[in-house]
């Protein structure tokens, strides 16, 4: 590997890190804005639950569709499109004046929420299996850090610059900037390029999506444990993300500073776990193929 290629692939990681960081900021800060938005539209907790459920349902439906598209078309162009959609839907979400419009436009933000599979597969073609855990750990840092930045924007910045709509304009605009950055500066890589098995091949075969192979995933018992573990892990976090801030403010009487200093240490500890876990996974994998398990 040339020094130039080595530097470039870390440039790609940097671009994708900021894509995830700013996207997670945009996605997760709505929980910190619950009281502001609920007061603006005069909605109940049940209606607030519908706001967040809409985006989750849309994202769930579109995960396999994004995956299918990533297997057939350029991942860089699709990721640029996802970033463009993120920026546009967030702007629409800020513009609408009625709760019905807000509900629909918020659900539309789920379109780009399910776009991450292509990012991870593209990174896998830049880095070999012995480095991926560390790189994925770095990228996953973006989620809790984005959560923290979203809290700061919602609790500290929004009241100072005109309310929640103003911060949506900021994060939506950043999505458009990232879309341009990915489109023009991130290069597609041949699929499987970083796999050791393909290292000495003069010409690589082009692989296409296969429904038959996709169905084989569900026959692997290990994958069912992964699905169940993911469900059990995500379930409580959705409650914390979308309802906990209003609970602290309304039920416990916390002010913005109190909420921030209560949640920030938890988020920072969570963030450290991503990088440490990824690095330990790489360390164990170098010694046995079952190291990450």
Residue ranges and their predicted role:
Residues 61-99:
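Conserved MFS/SLC helix-loop-helix module at the cytosolic interface between two early adjacent transmembrane helices
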Residues 187-212:
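Flexible cytoplasmic inter-helical loops of multi-pass small-molecule transporters
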Residues 28, 56-64, 114, 147-148, ...:
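Residue-level signature of mid-helix packing/kink "hotspots" within the transmembrane helices
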Residues 139-188:
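Helix-loop-helix hairpin linking two adjacent transmembrane segments in secondary transporters
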């Amino acid at each position: 590997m040339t020094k130039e290629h080595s530097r470039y692939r870390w440039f790609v990681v940097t671009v994708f890190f900021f894509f995830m960081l700013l996207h997670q900021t945009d996605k997760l800060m709505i929980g910190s804005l619950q009281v502001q938005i609920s007061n603006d539209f005069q909605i109940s907790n049940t209606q607030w639950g519908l706001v967040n459920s809409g985006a989750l349902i849309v994202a769930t439906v579109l995960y396999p569709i994004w995956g299918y598209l990533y297997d057939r078309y350029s991942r860089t162009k699709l990721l640029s499109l996802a970033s463009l959609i993120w920026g546009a839907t967030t702007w629409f979400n800020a513009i609408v004046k009625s709760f019905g419009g807000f509900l629909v436009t918020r659900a539309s933000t789920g379109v780009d929420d399910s776009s991450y599979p292509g990012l991870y597969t593209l990174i896998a073609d830049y880095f070999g299996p012995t480095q991926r855990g560390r790189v994925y750990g770095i990228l996953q840092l973006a989620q809790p850090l984005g959560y923290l930045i979203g809290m700061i924007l919602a609790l500290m910045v929004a009241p100072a610059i005109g309310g929640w709509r103003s911060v949506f304009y900021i994060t939506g605009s950043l999505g458009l900037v990232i879309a341009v950055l990915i489109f023009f500066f991130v290069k597609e890589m041949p699929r499987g390029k970083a796999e050791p098995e393909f290292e000495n091949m003069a010409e690589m075969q082009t692989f296409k999506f296969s429904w038959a192979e996709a169905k084989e995933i569900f026959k692997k018992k290990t994958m069912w444990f992964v699905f169940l573990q993911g469900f059990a892990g995500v379930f409580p976090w959705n409650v914390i993300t979308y309802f906990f801030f209003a609970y602290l403010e309304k039920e416990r009487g916390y002010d913005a500073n109190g909420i921030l200093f209560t949640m920030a240490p938890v988020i920072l500890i969570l963030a450290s776990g991503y990088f440490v876990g990824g690095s330990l996974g790489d360390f164990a994998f170098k010694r046995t193929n079952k190291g990450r398990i």
